[in-house]
Amino acid sequence: MAKEELLEFPGEVTELLPNATFRVKLENEHEIIAHTAGKMRKNRIRVLAGDKVLVEMTPYDLTKGRITYRFK
């Protein structure tokens, strides 16, 4: 099975939601719901409102994503 192509977009966290999910506004003005990636949870990287992040999305559902990096 081939690995699916993931889309990566920079964005900004606008709201914290329950269960480690976040509302993220992408640079192209779209708003999505994103959760933190497993490695970020494992290393206890905190994500707060206003943080600049890198979001990974699948081309099949462009309303959900995964936060893979928090910019310093």
UniProtKB/Swiss-Prot annotation:
One of the essential components for the initiation of protein synthesis. Stabilizes the binding of IF-2 and IF-3 on the 30S subunit to which N-formylmethionyl-tRNA(fMet) subsequently binds. Helps modulate mRNA selection, yielding the 30S pre-initiation complex (PIC). Upon addition of the 50S ribosomal subunit IF-1, IF-2 and IF-3 are released leaving the mature 70S translation initiation complex. The keyword Transferase does not apply. Keywords: Cytoplasm, Initiation factor, Protein biosynthesis, RNA-binding, rRNA-binding. One of its GO terms (cellular component) is cytosol. Belongs to the IF-1 family. It comes from Maricaulis maris (strain MCS10). It is found in: Cytoplasm. GO terms for molecular function: ribosome binding; rRNA binding; translation initiation factor activity. Transmembrane segments: none annotated. Component of the 30S ribosomal translation pre-initiation complex which assembles on the 30S ribosome in the order IF-2 and IF-3, IF-1 and N-formylmethionyl-tRNA(fMet); mRNA recruitment can occur at any time during PIC assembly. NCBIfam families: infA. Residues 1-72 form the S1-like domain. This is Translation initiation factor IF-1.
